[in-house]
């Protein structure tokens, strides 16, 4: 059965395996989450569970959201996300989802919002080559050609140009679960994941794992 959980990024560190080789890892506080709503094919057109994570004061929520949580009989949560599943019979509203749904050796996909870098040029944003730095060159780091002349007489959509960099939804696929700590709700995965410390992460079964 497919699995999913919400978490919060704690940061990166390194651990050693049985051979003494160092492994760069990311520590994630995963769960506990609670099922707030079930969606079915008959009523909603698809099967899914809505999951809440992170407690929040009632003062910070509007009336529709407060009513949503009261109907489910759960305390208000900061984050709400959906997981589409083929079979939701194992979940009921109020069911708690903990980090122990995963075990070492599992493969997961981690989704988050990447760090924002602000307005950036094409060299930083896309790795473009700079222009000549001497001999009378009038451009160094700016964009080169943006297209042809009279025909087509415009710059095509998708042309790589300066703009805001980062703050994108990014998914890192097929990360290995190195360690699971049910007591502290910690999930340790090999490699890096998107976003700054404290940012929301969505952890799912990997679509590439067999």
UniProtKB/Swiss-Prot annotation:
InterPro entries named among the record's database cross-references: Ribosomal_uL3, Ribosomal_uL3_bac/org-type, Ribosomal_uL3_CS, Transl_B-barrel_sf
Family per record: Belongs to the universal ribosomal protein uL3 family.
Species: Caldanaerobacter subterraneus subsp. tengcongensis (strain DSM 15242 / JCM 11007 / NBRC 100824 / MB4)
Assembly, per entry: Part of the 50S ribosomal subunit. Forms a cluster with proteins L14 and L19.
Protein name per the record: Large ribosomal subunit protein uL3
Keyword Ribonucleoprotein included in the entry's annotation: yes
GO biological process per UniProt: translation
Chain residue ranges for the region called Disordered: 131-165
Keywords assigned: Ribonucleoprotein, Ribosomal protein, RNA-binding, rRNA-binding
Pfam family, one: Ribosomal_L3
Role, per record: One of the primary rRNA binding proteins, it binds directly near the 3'-end of the 23S rRNA, where it nucleates assembly of the 50S subunit.
Coiled-coil ranges from the UniProt annotation: none
HAMAP family, alphabetized: Ribosomal_uL3_B
């Amino acid at each position: 059965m497919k699995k999913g959980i919400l978490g919060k990024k704690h940061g990166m560190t390194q651990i050693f395996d049985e051979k003494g080789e160092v492994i760069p890892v990311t520590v994630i506080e995963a769960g506990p989450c609670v099922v707030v709503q079930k969606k079915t094919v008959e009523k909603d057109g698809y099967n899914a569970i809505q999951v809440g994570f992170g407690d929040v004061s009632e003062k910070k929520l509007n009336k529709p959201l407060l009513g949503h949580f009261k109907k489910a009989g759960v305390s208000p949560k900061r984050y709400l996300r959906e997981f589409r599943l083929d079979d939701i019979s194992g979940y009921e509203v109020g069911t708690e989802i903990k980090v122990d749904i995963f075990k070492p050796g599992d493969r997961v996909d981690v989704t988050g919002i990447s760090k924002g870098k602000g307005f950036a040029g094409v060299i930083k944003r896309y790795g473009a080559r700079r222009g000549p730095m001497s001999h009378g060159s009038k451009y160094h780091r700016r964009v080169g050609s943006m297209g042809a002349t009279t025909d087509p007489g415009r710059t095509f959509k998708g042309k790589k140009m300066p703009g805001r960099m980062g703050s994108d939804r990014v998914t890192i696929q097929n990360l290995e679960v190195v360690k699971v700590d049910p007591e502290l709700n910690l999930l340790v995965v090999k490699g890096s994941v998107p976003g700054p410390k404290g940012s929301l992460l969505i952890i799912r079964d990997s679509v590439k794992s067999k």
